């Protein structure tokens, strides 16, 4: 359910004996388990870098979304939004620079470049589709290194639309159930092709395309967090 926001002023917080940064914007609202922390605790959310439910997350415990020119905007930014709602630390990394332009002309100022990402800091490496974005990711030596190193250390990989072909070309889908945008199946070397829109097999999640970007993002919350965080977010955004 969406909240109507009344932000208490400093005097109200003080009278309640609470620190302003850690008190809810909605009087009487129980924030335990709340998925919309940015709304309920806007000051603390901002203080913690805009991504943490229980305080700042460690930088070595994060999701990195790789962006290259020509990326599909909804496939990339829906997971950023949803994972941050779940309290996870998410960073965007640009291939070839910090400002990356999507396939529909939307530019994103990334948090870092691909050369600044350390595989040991990454729990989940996410590859959006879109053309020529997916081809540009595939051609990046830094992205290749990150994919191999994150996978080798047991981290998670996720790819949507055309991007699963990047994993397929590296032999990482062999023996796994996987899906992709129609027409790229031949690139998923050794995979068991699934008709499902979103598939998780082991440490790899794949999805068909932009139309299932929200389902893809919610599945990533499910595999990263225990409990019902994914369901709570789905309910809060009116997912049918």
Place the predicted regions along the sequence by residue:
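Cysteine-centered metal-binding/redox modules
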Residues: 2-56
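Short, thiol/selenol-centered motifs that function as redox-active sites or metal-ligating centers
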Residues: 34, 160-161
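Extended, subdomain-level signal for the structured scaffold at the beginning of enzyme domains
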Residues: 54-157, 165-169, 175, 187-195, ...
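Anionic-ligand binding patches
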Residues: 178
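Cytochrome P450 catalytic-domain "roof"
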Residues: 200
